[in-house]
Amino acid sequence: ASDLAGQAGNEAAVLFTTISDLDAAVFDDFNHCADPARLQRHAGYFAEDVEFYHDTGGVTWSRDEMLANTAKYACGNYGRERVEGTFQVHPIKGFGALSLGTHRFCQTATDSCDGLADFTMIWKRQDAGWVITRVLSYGHRSASADSAEASP
């Protein structure tokens, strides 16, 4: 039984590292998406029929629609940083993985990181690698409100 537990633990660690590295790559391209080549590379991480649910922005039903919003509202305006210690990865048997955590958004012009939100992504494992099929971005709030809640 301990061999199985060790194998499962190793598989979980490999999955965590894989998805964490992919998340970092997705958002490295997102953070540089004012460059059209980086926006296209960012696009490659998402399924054509990706569904993106945003608590304040609504729903998009395709990669093209999502990218149009990214180009219009995000590229050159702000970047994303994952909040250390919040990232989690869970396997989805026979499909892929679910990742979740908290991220902050930083204004490009001022370098101020005043927005926080929670996220969940569904990753599908395919022969050619991994692709994101669903994104939930929710709980958008100001970073100062979040730190005030954490204070005694």
Q: Each predicted region: which residue ranges?
A:
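Short beta-strand edge/turn micro-motifs at domain boundaries
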Residues: 1-3, 116-143
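Short, low-complexity N-terminal intrinsically disordered segments enriched in polar/charged residues
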Residues: 1-48, 144-152
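Solvent-exposed loop/turn segments at secondary-structure junctions
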Residues: 57-59, 104-106, 138-142
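A short acidic/glycine-rich loop-to-helix N-cap element
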Residues: 110-114, 142-148
